[in-house]
């Protein structure tokens, strides 16, 4: 297999603010307000999930192009205090690949007290760091886990690390990183084990959310005719459990919730493709290289790193960020004629 390029989109240093109201928040032309910040801190990962990364991994980002821990802390500070962000989630790649993660979390917790600091992780090695991350100020984690069958897990991730993942999940629970949620990608390869995964999550007392696979794989092999839709999953789970529709926690929450066997336990389904929630999206994304991405599927990014390293003040950086979000698309366009997936894969963008 040949190496897969990072697929860098068009990166701009400025954008038009024409027509934008004079408000501090991250508003866009369709009336949405971004309050949920996703910060990708690395492209590196300890697994090679087939829907996210090629087997050999992604090309390394030159160290000088990565945001430092202090730069990330400053940008999070700006997002919270100038732009109205109310939640921050660290993603990758795999965030645990950064040895300065605890420093980063502690800095953000100090500069933005009271703001939830979350992390999406594969949990490999988390058993050794969960307590320290909690002490630093991390409040909760989501763990990517598609199977609790060791052989199946190894095929999906190309790594035999399931025991480490389970140990990490349990360590996170002991450290009080709650609510602890499991994210599982819906694929033909995972559908047969979906009920077993839900059974395991119920026994561990953790929430489970299934996510429809989106066209964000590094090998660009996603095909609509092969994807597993939410309705198919519901039929499969319904063979073992009684599911009762429970709606969404709030309008901007992506997961539709279903009570399992009358509750109180629930299972969530994020139907990103078949029942998109773009009209309620409240996310803004910062890549590991310091660019703002308004949508997973955007073909443009706005460069904050260059401005930051050139001495730009906080308000100048905030205004660049506002411009990036003002021009956000109405939706991801997956269901539109002529849709073209982004060149960056999920591993390069940050989940």
Swiss-Prot record:
Cofactor or coenzyme needed: [4Fe-4S] cluster
PROSITE patterns: RADICAL_SAM
Entry keyword tRNA processing: no
The entry's keywords: 4Fe-4S, GTP-binding, Iron, Iron-sulfur, Lyase, Metal-binding, Molybdenum cofactor biosynthesis, Nucleotide-binding, S-adenosyl-L-methionine
Reactions accelerated catalytically: GTP + AH2 + S-adenosyl-L-methionine = (8S)-3',8-cyclo-7,8-dihydroguanosine 5'-triphosphate + 5'-deoxyadenosine + L-methionine + A + H(+)
First-tier enzyme category under EC: lyase
Record-listed E.C. numbers: 4.1.99.22
GO molecular function: 4 iron, 4 sulfur cluster binding; cyclic pyranopterin monophosphate synthase activity; GTP 3',8'-cyclase activity; GTP binding; metal ion binding; S-adenosyl-L-methionine binding
Sites where the protein binds [4Fe-4S] cluster 2: 278, 281, 295
Gene Ontology biological process: Mo-molybdopterin cofactor biosynthetic process
Assembly notes: Monomer and homodimer.
Protein name from the UniProt record: GTP 3',8-cyclase
Organism in which the protein naturally occurs: Rhodococcus jostii (strain RHA1)
